[in-house]
A protein has these predicted regions:
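Juxtamembrane/disordered regions of integral membrane proteins
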Residues: 2-162
Length: 162
């Protein structure tokens, strides 16, 4: 499969890439927001606070509105580097499956973004859910999902563009 990043960039070739990128960022951001909310609510519940389902759903909805912009910015920055790198690497690192390259690149990119953000944040971690290895791993699963979506869409588009 030829690498479509070797071809001339035209508006017709950039537009679908932007939509693929936005789909990956949107999915990762929404999933990550829900994951971090549930991790934080589990910590509150472990301290003995009652959390009825209605409150859990309301808090999740509020975080989708309130946390999503900040997390979306972090995801966007991470994916601006990770996904083009994956698109370039995927056809070149056989025998690794191309979708695995996209998923891994997205997770590594977001993991690095967490590290950079934490280095500059005034508190120990910018996102409370990433205080533990298990919380970080759960958050990175959202990036894996976004990477898989971008990879599947990009590979499908590349077959049609080639």
């Amino acid at each position: 499969m030829p690498c479509v990043y070797d071809t001339a960039m035209t508006l017709a070739s950039i537009k679908p890439r932007v939509w693929m990128f936005l789909a990956a960022v949107g999915l990762t951001t929404a999933l990550g927001s829900v994951i971090q909310t549930q991790i934080n609510l589990a910590a509150v519940q472990a301290m003995g606070a009652p959390l009825p389902w209605g409150l859990r759903l309301l808090t999740t909805a509020q975080d989708l509105i309130g946390f999503t912009p900040a997390f979306g910015g972090l995801v966007t920055g991470a994916f601006l580097a990770a996904l083009p790198a994956a698109a370039w690497l995927a056809p070149r690192v056989r025998p690794l499956p191309p979708l695995g390259v996209y998923a891994l690149a997205a997770a590594v990119g977001l993991g690095l973004a967490f590290q950079v953000a934490d280095a500059f944040a005034p508190m120990p971690t910018l996102i409370a859910a990433t205080r533990s290895a298990s919380g970080t791993a759960c958050m990175l699963l959202s990036a894996v999902a976004g990477g898989l979506v971008f990879g599947a869409l990009h590979m499908r588009w590349a077959r049609g563009a080639a």
